[in-house]
């Protein structure tokens, strides 16, 4: 038993080991704090005369060294204790020898501080070297020849960065030469991960150099290491389809290298030059990495290439993990039929290929997209029948499937409330089981609850959930923020605000109905859960004053219950603007007259320079579009401003029957492609007749009038300023597409606005001639045209213009597959007025135009 003595006297108290270690630990901590404080004071004084700045990374590195030293010291003492603890009780007091009692403590304390600091540094350094021995082989550390690089990039294993280490080895003299390739490659495969592409190329070159270019010696571990790093890469934004992708090309190059190695091996055997000790082999892990990256690129061609290559050449068929990756690819590409076929194949191949919970969760995600709740219930029953343990995500996905299915009365078979109630019960079951939750599960759980509350029209619960999630995320980011919180508010809010949460909140506003009661208020457990969230929602203040430097606030109305349409419209506008202006850190949606004139003056000069520099109209148009995109990213939170959230935001005044507000939102946040091209063309033709801005006197430009080199009428000047302001306002606008045109037609039906219907009919006709529409797949174009024609029939039916509705059907009967569900309302209206002739014509079109004929016609049109 080790003892500790306090003071230099002979008659002293003796403490057991645990208490002694506690005292020594406190003493070390105290000395460390004093040392750090002294160093900080020295650094502060030294900064007056030196330009050296201590970065937060350096401080973190030093603290990590101190923590590692403390842990190592504790382990050493613990090991010493375990060796000497035999035959002693933990609470016994051993006698102290006379030699120990006569030690002069004052003599020990007289050792200079510099020597103590030096000894402490030596201990820390030795502990650090021991730690490095477990991370990298000794020969690698010697060739890197920079312990700082190793420490800063590898010390924290959860955030290790091997790229600087590999790059440093690449420029070293020996690289990987004279290292045993077998043992080294085993360590390499299990350690070096998440390299960027250029570092992967460096690593591959060094591995080839190590084996003197003999591809036969390029073993399986080396292949797996390279493919693993390639599979973890992300494709570039401009090459999402995988066409001529550098990573795909590198993977194919490695497979060609492997084929060459097999060929050389076979030739050596035939020439009786000896069989190699170990021939490299392709593995399932390599195939999975190839498929993983191919799915990221959304490249069906490359995925099919790798599956065929491994199956035919290497005898490796996709396993459970590979097939799950394929299903996930089909899910992202909206190829649900192929996903279901692959899933059924997995169930009937063998027990090794039978789907696991990850595969089932993927299929549940497809059920959510298809709003197929019967199939989701069958899948959940299969999970239970095969004794597969559901995960947290399984219950969450079931709730989301039921929520999305309840949004449509036809899909839900008239049982929307029952589906939402069942969705909440799955979440109650998840809470009762207390399953493990990943950090991403919290987001998915909130999204599931937001979906159920939004489709139920429960605004109070949706507001509470939105507030609680955004507040939690905001405070977490601020607590872990390394920079200046007040200065970096723009970045913090950009990371905090989420488009999915905003979309569900807007959906709750759109489904507002003060007469409906929430589903959760119908049973005790639901009442308790709802009351819990509403109690945590601070509806009056929404302000956190615990930290005076950080104030969190959302622009909700200071009332707990919204009970009027005006309140819903006002709050939805406030929340929408708050998200687009990035938490109020930007001022984009409102501007004074002076600011507007400044913007016009600024962008007139910019557009002038574009027109003079461009060789033709297309180049000028490209420059303007690029500038608009850049301007939008600088002034709007593009993460939340998308077509899905805008569609939901525009649907709020439609459902609340507020025509004026709908038209205001539509005009302010959307633009049309043909109008944009007309404005661009006018500006280009006008600027080509104006000298470059460098030849004009800059002082002649004022906020009241902008002089040009040729006489301009007031009408011309107003038109130019209008066009420039149109371009400036595009920063908060999204181009109208087929979905938004359908929404406008639904608004015309709801408001019975014939002028709006005619306008959207003409505007969509012009949109059909633009490049964005013509680039769409032809089957999609036909489906979109059919949907819009159906809405036109609904509009004329509500207007009582039955002959116009029938005319649309007859003019498109050879193009569209008109079903009875599409003309049901028209048929009922004709029956009511007893127009037998029109009913006969209508039913003749519906009955004769079978689905098979429609497909045949589409096939003929595609061939043409």
Curated annotation (Swiss-Prot):
PROSITE patterns named among the record's database cross-references: PPR
Claim: Amino-acid biosynthesis is one of the keywords in the record: no
Repeat positions for PPR: 319-353, 356-390
GO cellular component: mitochondrion
Residues annotated as transit peptide in the record: 1-76
Keywords of this entry: Mitochondrion, mRNA processing, mRNA splicing, Repeat, Transit peptide
Keyword match Transferase: no
Subcellular compartments: Mitochondrion
A Pfam family recorded for this sequence: PPR_2
Database matches in NCBIfam families: PPR
PANTHER family from the UniProt entry: PENTATRICOPEPTIDE REPEAT-CONTAINING PROTEIN GUN1, CHLOROPLASTIC (PTHR47936:SF1), PPR_LONG DOMAIN-CONTAINING PROTEIN (PTHR47936)
Note from the entry: Involved in mitochondrial-nuclear incompatibility, a major determinant in reproductive isolation between species, through hybrid incompatibility of Ccm1 and its interacting partner 15S rRNA between yeast species.
Function of the protein: Regulates mitochondrial small subunit maturation by controlling 15S rRNA 5'-end processing. Localizes to the 5' precursor of the 15S rRNA in a position that is subsequently occupied by mS47 in the mature yeast mtSSU. Uses structure and sequence-specific RNA recognition, binding to a single-stranded region of the precursor and specifically recognizing bases -6 to -1. The exchange of Ccm1 for mS47 is coupled to the irreversible removal of precursor rRNA that is accompanied by conformational changes of the mitoribosomal proteins uS5m and mS26.
Family: Belongs to the CCM1 family.
Assembly mode: Binds to mitochondrial small subunit 15S rRNA.
Designated name of the protein: Mitochondrial 15S rRNA processing factor CCM1
Organism (species): Saccharomyces cerevisiae (strain RM11-1a)
Gene giving rise to this polypeptide: CCM1
């Amino acid at each position: 038993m080790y003892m500790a003595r306090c003071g230099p006297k002979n008659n002293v108290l003796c403490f057991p080991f645990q208490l002694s270690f506690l005292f020594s630990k406190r003493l070390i901590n105290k000395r460390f704090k004093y040392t750090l404080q002294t160093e900080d004071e020295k650094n502060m004084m030294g900064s007056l005369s030196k330009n050296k700045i201590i970065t937060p990374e350096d401080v973190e590195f030093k603290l990590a060294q101190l923590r590692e030293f403390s842990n190592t010291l504790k382990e050493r003492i613990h090991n010493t204790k375990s060796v000497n603890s035999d035959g002693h009780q933990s609470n016994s007091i051993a006698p102290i020898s006379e030699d120990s009692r006569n030690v002069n403590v004052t003599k020990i304390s007289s050792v200079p501080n510099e020597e103590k600091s030096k000894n402490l540094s030596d201990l820390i350094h030795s502990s650090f070297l021991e730690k490095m021995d477990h991370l990298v082989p000794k020969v690698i550390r010697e060739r890197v020849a920079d312990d700082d690089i190793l420490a800063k990039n590898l010390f924290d294993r959860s955030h290790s960065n091997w790229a600087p280490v590999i790059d440093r080895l690449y420029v070293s003299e020996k690289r990987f030469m004279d290292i045993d390739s077998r043992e080294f490659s085993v360590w390499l495969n299990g350690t070096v991960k998440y390299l960027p592409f250029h570092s992967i190329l460096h690593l591959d070159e060094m591995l080839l150099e190590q084996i003197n270019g003999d591809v036969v010696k390029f073993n399986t571990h080396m292949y797996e290491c390279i493919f693993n790093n390639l599979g973890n890469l992300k494709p570039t934004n401009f090459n999402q389809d995988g066409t001529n992708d550098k990573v795909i090309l590198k993977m194919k190059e490695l497979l060609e290298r492997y084929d060459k190695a097999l060929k050389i091996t076979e030739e050596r055997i035939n020439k009786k030059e000896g069989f190699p000790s170990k021939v490299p082999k392709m593995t399932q892990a390599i195939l999975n990495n190839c498929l993983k990256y191919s799915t990221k690129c959304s490249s069906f061609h490359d995925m099919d290439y790798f599956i065929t290559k491994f199956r035919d050449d290497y005898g490796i068929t996709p396993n459970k993990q590979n097939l799950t990756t394929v299903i996930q690819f089909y899910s992202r590409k909206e190829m649900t039929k192929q996903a279901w076929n692959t899933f059924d194949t997995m169930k009937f191949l063998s027990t090794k290929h039978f789907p696991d919970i990850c595969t089932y969760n993927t299929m549940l995600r497809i059920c959510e997209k298809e709003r197929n709740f019967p199939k989701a219930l069958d899948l959940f029953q299969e999970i239970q029948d095969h004794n597969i343990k559901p995960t947290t995500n399984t219950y969450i996905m079931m709730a989301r499937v039921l929520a999305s299915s309840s949004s449509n009365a036809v899909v839900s078979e008239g049982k929307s409330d029952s589906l939402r109630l069942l969705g909440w019960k799955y979440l109650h079951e998840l809470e009762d089981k207390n399953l493990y939750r990943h950090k991403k599960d919290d987001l998915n759980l909130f999204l599931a609850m937001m979906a159920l509350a939004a489709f139920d029209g429960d605004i109070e619960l949706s507001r509470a959930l939105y507030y609680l999630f955004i507040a939690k995320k905001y405070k977490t980011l601020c607590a872990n923020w390394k920079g200046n919180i007040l200065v970096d508010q723009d970045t913090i809010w950009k990371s905090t605000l989420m488009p999915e949460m905003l979309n569900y909140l807007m959906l709750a506003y759109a489904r507002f109905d003060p007469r409906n009661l929430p589903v959760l208020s119908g049973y005790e457990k639901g009442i308790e859960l709802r009351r819990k969230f509403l109690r945590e929602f601070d509806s009056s203040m929404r302000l956190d004053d615990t930290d005076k430097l950080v104030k969190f606030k959302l622009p909700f109305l200071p009332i707990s219950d919204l009970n009027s349409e005006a309140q819903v419209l006002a709050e939805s506008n406030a929340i929408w603007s708050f998200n687009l202006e990035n938490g109020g850190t930007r001022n984009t949606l409102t501007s004074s007259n002076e600011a507007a004139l400044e913007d016009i003056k600024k962008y007139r000069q910019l557009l002038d320079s574009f027109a003079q520099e461009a060789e033709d109209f297309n180049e000028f148009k490209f420059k303007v579009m690029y500038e608009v995109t850049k301007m939008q990213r600088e002034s709007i939170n593009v993460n939340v401003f998308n077509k899905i959230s805008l569609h939901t935001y525009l649907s709020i005044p439609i459902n609340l029957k507020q025509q004026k507000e709908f038209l205001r939102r539509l005009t302010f946040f959307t633009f049309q492609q043909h109008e944009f091209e007309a404005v661009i063309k006018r500006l280009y033709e006008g600027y080509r007749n104006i000298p470059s801005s460098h030849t004009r006197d800059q002082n002649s430009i004022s906020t009241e009038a902008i002089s040009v080199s040729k006489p301009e009428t007031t009408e011309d000047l107003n038109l130019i300023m209008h066009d420039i302001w149109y371009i400036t306002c595009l920063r908060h606008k999204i181009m109208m597409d087929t979905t938004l045109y359908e929404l406008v037609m639904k608004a015309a039906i709801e408001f019975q606005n014939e002028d709006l219907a005619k306008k959207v009919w003409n505007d969509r006709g012009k949109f059909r001639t633009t490049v964005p529409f013509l680039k769409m797949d032809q089957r999609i174009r036909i489906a979109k045209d059919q949907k819009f024609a159906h809405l036109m029939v609904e509009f004329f039916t509500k207007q009582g213009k039955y002959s116009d509705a029938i005319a649309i059907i007859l003019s498109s009967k050879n193009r569209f597959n008109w079903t009875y569900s599409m003309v049901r309302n028209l048929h009922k209206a004709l029956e009511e007025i007893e127009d037998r002739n029109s009913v006969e014509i209508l039913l003749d079109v519906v009955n004769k135009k079978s689905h098979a004929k429609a497909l045949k016609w589409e096939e003929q049109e595609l061939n043409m």
